[in-house]
Amino acid sequence: MHIPESIHALICFGARPGEGNPALVVEGGDPSPQARQRLARGRNTTCVFIDEDGDGTVRVDYWYPHMRSPLCLHATLAVAAVLFRRTPDAEVIAVETAMHGQRLALLRDGDDYFVRLAAQAVPQVDVTAAQAAALLGTAPVSPPRLASVGSPKLLVEVRDAAALYALQPDLAWIAAWSRQHGINGIYAWYRCEDGVYEGRNFNHLDPALEDAATGVAAGALTIALGRSLVLYQGRAVGGDCLIRTRIDGPALLVGGAAAFA
């Protein structure tokens, strides 16, 4: 018998109240992969399912409308908001990803939530500037890089905001190339000023589902640049999102706002 399903709707990484990337946190319900994919596709929204084992381990299972994902940080912020509401006196809440058993620490700082995690291995793929330009439709201004905090990203720097928002790549081609190489899409970004960046994520097949905020890309960019950063995202989809990262010894923190919708 399944535990009755409870669904929480949240918006995450919003730069202002009412803004953010939507996610559904699901407790209980049918745990089969087919049911989870069906729910994510039916709601047309990123879903994260919370599973609690008898030993107290909390596992998080991420599903996009078109595929399962090893890690999604805006959905993890949503999980943090749900779990801290349940246990408001907790200082740190530990969870584990369902696909790869990656351990994540959830923290709260005022009205914001952070995920502490570490750099992960990336596929051994040599991506040339010409290949990146063909995939994205514009020439990168620095060598493309691969980095990961649990969901490998190809990071491609573009010239400026105009170049970033002119991008209209072939999403099906990016998805096929990503599957072939074990990479979860392309993150295009540019430098606004010292320590401040703006980007767009190309991972979903449907352009209407472009992320307003991509925490795993912010983490990957932090690793690639070797510095803490402030990252804006979402203007392409009418949103206004803000992701903050901090290097924390051998780990890093990725966080921002999470609010119940």
Where are these regions (language model features)?
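Conserved hydrophobic/aromatic beta-strand scaffold that supports enzyme active sites
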Residues: 25, 49, 114, 153-155, ...
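Acidic, low-complexity central loop/insert segments
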Residues: 63-175, 213, 217-261
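Alpha-helix C-cap/termination motif
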Residues: 42, 86, 180-181, 224
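Conserved phosphate-donor
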Residues: 43-58, 173-207, 232-257
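A short glycine/serine-rich beta->alpha loop
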Residues: 12-15, 61-70, 204-211
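Hydrophobic anchor at the start of a short beta-strand
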Residues: 5-7, 47-48, 144, 186, ...
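ATP-binding N-lobe of GHMP and related small-molecule kinases
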Residues: 1-62, 149, 251, 255
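Short, surface-exposed beta-edge/turn micro-motifs
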Residues: 21-22, 45-46, 151-153, 183-186, ...
